[in-house]
Design a protein with these regions (language model features):
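A short, glycine-centered helix-capping/turn motif at helix boundaries
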Residues: 4, 65-79, 204-205, 216
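Flexible interdomain linker/hinge and immediately adjacent N-terminus
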Residues: 5-43, 148-149
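Basic, Lys/Arg- and aromatic-enriched nucleic-acid-binding interface segment
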Residues: 39-73
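Short, basic (Lys/Arg/His-rich) helix/loop patches that form interaction surfaces
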Residues: 50, 159-212, 219
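Active-site/catalytic core of tyrosine-dependent DNA strand-transfer enzymes
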Residues: 115-184
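Catalytic-site neighborhood detector that most strongly recognizes the C-terminal catalytic loop/helix
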Residues: 207, 214-239
Length: 243
């Protein structure tokens, strides 16, 4: 009896009934800023830079870089494996600018630099007393310390820079009657800026281009940011009649 009992493989029996199992879990929602929240955030960063350029031109550059180049927070700080420098902005023979970084999994990648991001870089560099554009091999730190020399070496410091901007933007949103949006912004993290940049660009750029700039391992990851079809699907269903 015992031998007959053991011959029945419970795992195999479960697999035989696999048609009753869910084949795909609902993917977690991408956390990102709404267009309204981003408008308040970047406007706030620009206002902060105008009021205290010695401190907040850096804030404005950090916000632009996280959004426009989909950077992870670790890609802005000095680490034992990578020290981001101005010379990592490089122009090719056609005059196109790229940013070289080492990201997740110690993988090196090139990020295409938009005209708007290039202008943001020029503004930041001029505020630091540098030439408007980097020269090959330039070793100046990408995100400088306001006290002392060298680049920022702690993700905590970057979080502090971003959080200060988020808090100020949320305060402005409340003052303008956007209380719910302000509360959601108060819960945002630095990584939301990367998600926001990807989500906006994937609406009008080829997904393969966004995938490579973001450093995604596959297009399936990038596809998670595409919600235009989902919105259109719901809009087409909204006026369906039952009777």
């Amino acid at each position: 009896i015992q031998e007959s009992y053991l011959s029945a493989n419970p795992v195999a029996q479960i697999r035989q009934k696999s048609k009753f199992l869910r084949k795909q879990q609902i993917q977690s929602k991408i956390r990102r800023l709404s267009p309204l929240q981003w408008d308040f955030v970047i406007d706030t960063a620009e206002a902060m830079a105008a009021e205290q350029p010695q401190v907040h031109e850096r804030t404005l550059f950090v916000m632009n870089a996280l959004f426009a180049m989909y950077l992870r927070i670790s890609e802005l700080v000095d680490t034992s494996r990578w020290q981001p420098q101005m010379g990592h902005f490089q122009a090719d023979q056609e005059g196109n600018w790229w940013f070289l970084t080492v990201g997740k999994g110690n993988k090196e990648r090139e990020i295409s630099v938009s005209d708007a991001m290039l202008e943001a870089l020029k503004r930041y560099r001029l505020s630091r007393g540098l030439l408007s554009l980097p020269i090959p091999g330039e070793s100046a730190p990408l995100v400088h310390k306001t006290r002392g020399k060298g680049g920022i070496g702690s993700t905590r410091q970057i979080r502090g820079i971003v959080q200060k901007c988020f808090d100020a933007a949320a305060q402005k949103m409340r003052a303008n009657g956007f209380s719910e949006d302000a509360e959601r912004l108060s819960a945002a993290t630095v990584h939301w800026l990367r998600h926001t940049g990807i989500s906006e660009d994937v609406k009008h750029r080829p997904r393969e281009h966004v995938r490579d700039d973001a450093g995604h391992g596959s297009s399936a990851i990038t596809d998670r940011y595409i919600d235009v079809e989902r919105a259109e699907r719901h809009a087409s269903a909204r006026q369906k009649l039952i009777k």
